Amino acid sequence: MYSPDTTKYLIHISLTAEGVVEKPDVVGAIFGQTEGLLGEDLDLRDLQRTGRVGRIDVQIASKKGETSGEILISTSLDRAETAILAASLETIDRVGPCVAHVSVKMVEDIRVSKRKKIVERAKEILVERFDDGTIDSDELLDDVRQTLRVEKIGTIGEEKLPAGPNVLESDAIIIVEGRADVINLLRYGIKNTVAVEGTNIPKSIVELTEKKTTTAFFDGDRGGELILRELLQVADIDFVAFSPRGKSVEDMSKKEVIKTLRNKVPVEYVRDQYFEDSAELPGDLGGRPARTAPAHDEGGNSDTTGKQAVSQKRIRDGTSKVPTTLRDHMDDVKGKNVARFLNQDMVVIRESRSEEVEKAVETLEEPAAGVVVDRTVDQKLLDRLVWKGLEYVAAKDFKGIIKRPLNIRLMKMSS
């Protein structure tokens, strides 16, 4: 039996008959007039029986007393045998009772057609189906460096807390939730990170915060807020930073980590969110000024304390004209009776008078990440800001807040 998968060539034959004939007449003429013509090895019936020649496809039509059309014969013979078979078909001079003229139009190499289809399909697969595996030398170097950094993770204290290699030597530390957070920050060259490993704050953490400038860097979910609440009660925290909404610290990219740490805020700006009375905070934490020191120790170099102190001094003196952090905006807005809507990059997208903030939030032309407003925020205004999808509100004060939404962060400006 002939298999179409073995086809090598397809013979195209044109047929013209001087009269009306039908398909059985054409097939009969082909077998009858070629029988015994080429010997036993190339007999058409034997070739079909052994599966070396396929079925004879006759496509004809009659018009005005004449019949014309095409005959298609597929073969798995070699080139020479196929040529001989095709030539033998041109000897047919009668179909039924009619004079006929038969000629070979072409012999199509099916394998060439298959190759063309393969090439076209390969092009599609190359463009659409392959993952982007482009090798970038910078990415390779980063991967190797990240591996080295991760291998340097160690432990500190009796509790064996996961920590970066520079925690004990650095003037500033970052406190995160777990080991995965330490590893992620270590990948990006931040080596002064230590994990609390749960809500029971270890003694080693408390002792470190008393000696070093400390930034608390937690997930912006309920768990992160609970850890921060306990940490504020037992430890000496200077700055607070939260991961973006919907992301944990361990999943953040390098750009997101650096941006979040750069936009950290002093603990005084967030303590009212967790404590109704600042007396709940330990010692004089509620009233002491925040120490100015680097939030992260990248590449083992912690000599950025002076630079940050100068930067913050310029902000306090009013010599920095373009605020770049949330703290800058809070200091800049204070006492000016204005409201600023900020995007994720801390860029002002809308500014209005503080008493017109309700109208301004309804006419924003682009999404805002938060608002800094020099006025007291009540429950009605807060609900409207939450409905607009804001992530944080920094205000002069908060009054009458009975229902505090979990998906927005409230920060009170220091007086």
From Swiss-Prot:
Catalytic activity annotation: ssDNA + n NTP = ssDNA/pppN(pN)n-1 hybrid + (n-1) diphosphate
Family recorded in the similarity comment: Belongs to the archaeal DnaG primase family.
SUPFAM superfamilies registered for this protein in UniProt: DNA primase core (SSF56731)
GO cellular component, as recorded: cytoplasm; DNA-directed RNA polymerase complex; exosome (RNase complex); primosome complex
Enzyme class: transferase
Polar residues: compositionally biased ranges: 301-311
Keywords: DNA replication, DNA-directed RNA polymerase, Magnesium, Metal-binding, Nucleotidyltransferase, Primosome, Transcription, Transferase
Chain's role: RNA polymerase that catalyzes the synthesis of short RNA molecules used as primers for DNA polymerase during DNA replication.
InterPro entries in UniProt: DnaG_primase, Primase_DnaG_arc, TOPRIM_DnaG/twinkle, TOPRIM_dom
Co-factor remark: Binds two Mg(2+) per subunit.
Region Disordered, annotated ranges: 280-323
Record: residues binding Mg(2+) 2: D219, D221
EC number of the protein: 2.7.7.101
Domain of life of the organism encoding this protein: Archaea
This protein's record includes keyword Ribosomal protein: no
GO biological process: DNA replication, synthesis of primer
Identification of the protein by name: DNA primase DnaG
GO MF terms held by the record: DNA-directed RNA polymerase activity; metal ion binding; poly(A) binding
Residues holding Mg(2+) 1: E177, D219
